[in-house]
């Protein structure tokens, strides 16, 4: 397992660093503005907040925002995930226990069983669920009334949501990668909470290698803290960060060994591409979902690869970063290839 895939490692500490309010939440300014207006209006009307869908790559704060919403609205939050909702009875049991105005947070909502998803339609619109009892000719439908609630869904692949489910969300908010400056603020806030002293330059080094992702920034901070502890250093300084990054094999762009392996495979085995995602994943012995959800978004955002109708292509930036001679000068090569594939 590479560093970026360690989504659950040390999550207890990460949870303790979560902000409780929108004011304390750093970054995602446009999303925060929309949430502030929606929550304030719902409070003034004394009604539940509209259903919300958060989408974006892992680690950008979708779960944290769900907790912030519950805290700001003064309501309880009920947490589950799409893959565990296998039967209609599963969702009926959760929905029937919800109090008025509560928040139901469903992570990986795109992975909900389709039969369960259909139960949601009436629950989200009319606050009622119809459950089938029994099988065959003796089967009958029971309607259960629900207290008004707010569904907050989180997905890394919003395109996999069916239109009927997607259309029942009143707000669909796309989370963006964070800037280095925003990540520095998050790192310094975490250091203050954990009583760690850190140099400005050290915070910048960590932030610049965190792939625009708070979760990764905080994990990197923890690893740097480990190195500082072993070396009996009382303050996190730049050389400690650089030493830690060398140990973790994380380069200046924030790429780990698997990221570089993806790019090397594209360049060495597929001559830079294009190559289909299935073939690339099979060559790497990597799950397609891991490639598409964990690694590809950042590689795309950094301009290291592009997607074309014929598959993924390594860009001139990727060749340069890994020290390969470019087949053709970066920008011209990338643009001409993109146009030829789109024509």
Curated annotation (Swiss-Prot):
GO biological process: DNA recombination; DNA repair
Enzyme class: hydrolase
Organism per entry: Pseudothermotoga lettingae (strain ATCC BAA-301 / DSM 14385 / NBRC 107922 / TMO) (Thermotoga lettingae)
PANTHER family the UniProt entry points to: HOLLIDAY JUNCTION BRANCH MIGRATION COMPLEX SUBUNIT RUVB, PTHR42848
A GO CC term assigned to this protein in UniProt: Holliday junction resolvase complex
Function: The RuvA-RuvB-RuvC complex processes Holliday junction (HJ) DNA during genetic recombination and DNA repair, while the RuvA-RuvB complex plays an important role in the rescue of blocked DNA replication forks via replication fork reversal (RFR). RuvA specifically binds to HJ cruciform DNA, conferring on it an open structure. The RuvB hexamer acts as an ATP-dependent pump, pulling dsDNA into and through the RuvAB complex. RuvB forms 2 homohexamers on either side of HJ DNA bound by 1 or 2 RuvA tetramers; 4 subunits per hexamer contact DNA at a time.
Superkingdom of this protein's organism: Bacteria
CDD domains: AAA
Classification via InterPro entries: AAA+_ATPase, AAA_lid_4, DNA_helicase_Holl-junc_RuvB, P-loop_NTPase, RuvB-like_N, RuvB_C, WH-like_DNA-bd_sf, WH_DNA-bd_sf
GO molecular function, one term: four-way junction helicase activity
Keywords: ATP-binding, Cytoplasm, DNA damage, DNA recombination, DNA repair, DNA-binding, Hydrolase, Nucleotide-binding
Catalyzed reaction equations: ATP + H2O = ADP + phosphate + H(+)
Residues binding ATP, per UniProt: 17-18, 59, 62-64, 125-127, 168, 178, 215
EC number: 3.6.4.-
Region (Small ATPAse domain (RuvB-S)): 179-249
Protein name (database record): Holliday junction branch migration complex subunit RuvB
Self-association state and partner proteins as the record states: Homohexamer. Forms an RuvA(8)-RuvB(12)-Holliday junction (HJ) complex. HJ DNA is sandwiched between 2 RuvA tetramers; dsDNA enters through RuvA and exits via RuvB. An RuvB hexamer assembles on each DNA strand where it exits the tetramer. Each RuvB hexamer is contacted by two RuvA subunits (via domain III) on 2 adjacent RuvB subunits; this complex drives branch migration. In the full resolvosome a probable DNA-RuvA(4)-RuvB(12)-RuvC(2) complex forms which resolves the HJ.
Gene designation: ruvB
Binding sites annotated in the UniProt record for DNA: 307, 312
SUPFAM superfamilies, per the entry: P-loop containing nucleoside triphosphate hydrolases (SSF52540), Winged helix' DNA-binding domain (SSF46785)
Main location: cytoplasm
Residues the record lists as binding Mg(2+): 63
Region spans: Head domain (RuvB-H): 252-343
Localization, UniProt: Cytoplasm
NCBIfam families reported for this sequence: PRK00080.1, ruvB
Large ATPase domain (RuvB-L) as annotated region, ranges: 1-178
Domains as described in the record: Has 3 domains, the large (RuvB-L) and small ATPase (RuvB-S) domains and the C-terminal head (RuvB-H) domain. The head domain binds DNA, while the ATPase domains jointly bind ATP, ADP or are empty depending on the state of the subunit in the translocation cycle. During a single DNA translocation step the structure of each domain remains the same, but their relative positions change.
Family label: Belongs to the RuvB family.
């Amino acid at each position: 397992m590479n560093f970026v895939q360690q989504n659950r490692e040390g999550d207890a500490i990460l949870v303790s660093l979560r902000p409780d309010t929108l004011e304390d939440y750093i970054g995602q300014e446009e999303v925060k503005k929309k949430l502030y207006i929606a929550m304030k209006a719902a409070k003034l009307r004394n009604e539940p907040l509209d259903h919300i869908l958060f989408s974006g790559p892992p680690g950008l704060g979708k779960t944290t925002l769900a907790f912030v919403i519950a805290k700001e609205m003064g309501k309880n939050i009920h947490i589950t995930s799409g893959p565990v909702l296998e039967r209609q009875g599963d969702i009926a049991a959760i929905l029937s226990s919800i109090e008025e105005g509560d928040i139901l947070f469903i992570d990986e909502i795109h992975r909900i069983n389709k039969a369960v998803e259909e139960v949601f339609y009436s629950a989200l619109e009319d606050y009622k669920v119809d459950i089938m009892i029994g099988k065959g000719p003796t089967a009958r439908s029971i309607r259960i009334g629900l207290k008004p609630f707010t569904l907050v869904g989180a997905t890394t692949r919003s395109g996999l949501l069916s239109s009927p489910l997607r259309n029942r969300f009143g707000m669909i908010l796309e989370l963006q990668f964070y800037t280095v400056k925003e990540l520095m603020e998050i790192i310094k806030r975490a250091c203050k909470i954990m009583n760690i002293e850190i140099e400005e330059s050290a915070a910048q080094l960590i932030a610049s290698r965190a792939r625009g992702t708070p979760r990764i920034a905080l994990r990197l901070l923890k690893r740097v803290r480990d190195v500082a502890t072993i070396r009996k250093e009382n303050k996190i300084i730049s050389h400690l960060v650089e030493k830690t990054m060398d140990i973790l094999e994380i380069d200046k762009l924030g790429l780990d060994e698997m990221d570089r392996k993806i790019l090397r495979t594209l360049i060495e085995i597929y001559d830079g591409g294009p190559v289909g995602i299935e073939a690339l994943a099979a060559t790497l012995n990597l799950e397609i979902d891991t490639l598409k959800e964990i690694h590809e978004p950042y590689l795309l955002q950094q301009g290291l690869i592009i997607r074309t109708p014929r598959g993924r292509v390594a860009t001139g930036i990727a060749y340069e970063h890994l020290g390969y001679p470019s087949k053709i000068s970066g920008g011209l090569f990338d643009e001409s290839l993109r146009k030829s594939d789109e024509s």
